[in-house]
Amino acid sequence: MPKINLTRRQFLKASGASLFLAGLPLPGFTKDEPPGTISVIMLEGGMDGLTAVPPFGDPDLSKMRKNLIPDNYLKLNSFFGLHPSFQYFSGLMAKNNASVIHATNFPYTKRSHFEGQNLMQGGGLSPFSETTGWLGRALDLAKTPGRSMSLDMPLLLRGAHENDNFFPASIRNSGTLKTDLINMISNAHAQESSSIFTKVSKKSTQKESVVPRDPASLAKYAGKAMSIKSGPLSSVIKVDQFDTHSNQGSDEYGRHGERLAIIDDIIAGYKEGLGDAWDRSIILTLTEFGRTVKENGTWGTDHGWGSAGLLAGGAINKSRVISNWPGLAERDLFEKRDLISTIDYRSVCAACIEHALGLDHDLIVDKVFFTPSLPRIYDYIFS
């Protein structure tokens, strides 16, 4: 039989999933057990921070956006509001269990989905410079053996250590085709990967209906898994379709508003699933870039830079809107079109890692983000 030129990574990409769990505490891990869990909601396409958290106190907002400002926004303070899709998140803000970071993002300004998504997961200094992800590297430093919910391991969770499946993964074909595929690939890679495909073959015979598919149920499922003492320490849920170049809408029934409602449902699902473990949890959103400040000619927005980040969890004990607001006047925008990112979102991620995994800030910024000068903003979020 001829050898098939199929790498393990290519095989792993053959199975799609929306939820990933990783980072299992070491057996007998007690005194030095990491104090919390960290969950990431990846928002692919570029979430519009000005729609999600409208700065209604900025006089230039209404000049730039005549059709995209939600009328019934939820007031946070004298300057910022929340999109009406965030009913649950708003309640967490009122209970001091959620915060917003605004005018923030990763230091990437080229507006490419592929490059931006790679950087938000890899956390490298340039696109495609890393084969591991920032959360995976953090789990490595915390010495937690990773386990993944799916064969399709996202870059964000990849570390130097091997990741095994925590739950059965599904290859979306018939059982016969699935078995034939595994046997074919296993034979082609008999020397270098027999143990890998033995694991895959065993898991392929398990029931595939265990894991729910809707985002809220996935979050609840992940929360329950992380609430167990021997369960995973981290999870990732992906939500796409934020690339609203046309007919974006302004209220909860618009295209962007419907995606924001999914975020709200995911956070609610996490809280329900985590139960008492909510008190040691932190949830954060990631997006590759924001949207243009000025709406375009098709009632939408184009690729931008700065956006907003949402944080939730019992680890937060005081709700805040954390922002060094740059302004929306054209002279204040990046290249006269984008909200400037004044807070490096890697600092936000570093603070969440520090809290959840108990790692030192200097170690995180050096070994996870390769930027020793990255500011520490832990106290702004968690004190």
Across the structure, where does each feature detected by a protein language model lie?
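Solvent-exposed loop/turn segments at secondary-structure junctions
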Residues: E44-D48, N105-T109, P154-L157, Q241-T244, ...
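N-terminal secretory signal peptides and thylakoid transit peptides that target proteins
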Residues: M1-L19
